[in-house]
Regions:
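Pyridoxal 5′-phosphate
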Residues: 1-167
């Protein structure tokens, strides 16, 4: 659906392979994939990102903290820039940041976390979205998870995830 009015995706080579492979798949589906430059200190080059931004950008995705070298990306600055482009959804991979650094998520449209990175069980994750109307369901059926992902909620896993976050 997004491809019809904003078919450009911007990411960087710093992303986790699980993100980069999805980006490459989306490119085979007709999206235009652009890579933002990285500065010598391992941060996204805000000036280059600004040059890449157009009204055709539908998604900008980046990790908050790099999983190999530990660089913290300028999420607040990126979010401020993207505010000027209402079609651009700003997703942050917060897997390495949660519980380790204070997170600034103003102007971020979605952020994802993986439970095993903060002592949760493998296979658990969290996706926080600013507006559920912006996404389509991934699994259809009973309407659980606000109609976005139907299926019986695994209460025990959810409770264990919350407990892991508290620890």
């Amino acid at each position: 659906r997004k491809k019809q009015f904003a078919n450009v995706i911007i990411t960087s080579v710093l992303e986790h392979p699980s993100v980069l492979e999805v980006m490459r798949y989306l490119e085979t589906q007709g999206f235009i994939l652009k890579y933002v430059n990285v500065t010598p200190n391992g941060q996204i080059d805000i000036n280059h990102l600004e040059q890449l931004m157009t009204d055709n950008v539908g998604l900008v995705t980046c990790m908050y903290v790099n999983n190999v070298m530990g660089q913290i990306q300028p999420i607040k600055e990126i979010g401020s820039l993207l505010k000027q482009y209402p079609k651009a959804h700003f997703h942050v991979d917060g897997v390495q940041a949660l519980g380790k650094i204070p997170m600034q998520l103003e102007n971020v449209n979605s952020v994802s976390f993986s439970g095993h990175k903060f002592n949760g069980l493998k296979g658990q994750g969290i996706l926080i979205i600013d507006n559920k109307e912006k996404i389509e369901p991934t699994v259809f059926g009973g309407g659980q998870e606000y109609g976005i992902r139907s299926g019986t909620v695994n209460l025990a896993m959810n409770v264990s995830l919350v407990k892991a976050m508290e620890i």
